């Protein structure tokens, strides 16, 4: 059991016999009395996102998760296939379970899968990935005067704002936690 004040983004909790992944946590404290913790969580089984409100001091059950190092193999429609690097067992995860991580997956990429018991429930990406820019506007002299950047589309379909000097065909390093451009690779 974990106190609701200790809930953090990314934790797995068991509520009403379902496993939820915490997407967002907001803590509100009043001058008198106890605080209120509002959370946004995704149900692993159904994929629905739901909000929960807790009073400080309440306790919830934390789900025990394990990680397995896997390799992303390929995509077939809405299913993504991974192979355990130790046992060579293959797992198929639905696009709804993977969520926004689909924009960072490249074939043969190594990453971790989260498991509850023997069921895969999520993907743990590396902090950064290297992606190729497949579409971006050309740069013109004087673009840098206004600052900012220009939109680019990467090989996985990810849309990211890049500096003006980045061109189509170049590889860039992207932060998987924020979806932002870091540097040229």
UniProtKB/Swiss-Prot annotation:
Record's subcellular location: Cytoplasm
Q: Which function does this protein serve?
A: Involved in peptide bond synthesis. Stimulates efficient translation and peptide-bond synthesis on native or reconstituted 70S ribosomes in vitro. Probably functions indirectly by altering the affinity of the ribosome for aminoacyl-tRNA, thus increasing their reactivity as acceptors for peptidyl transferase.
Q: Which Pfam families is this protein grouped with?
A: EFP, EFP_N, Elong-fact-P_C
What pathway annotation does it carry? Protein biosynthesis; polypeptide chain elongation
Gene Ontology molecular function, alphabetical: translation elongation factor activity
One of its GO biological process terms is:
peptide biosynthetic process
Gene name linked to the record = efp
Name this protein carries in UniProt:
Elongation factor P
Q: What is its main location?
A: cytoplasm
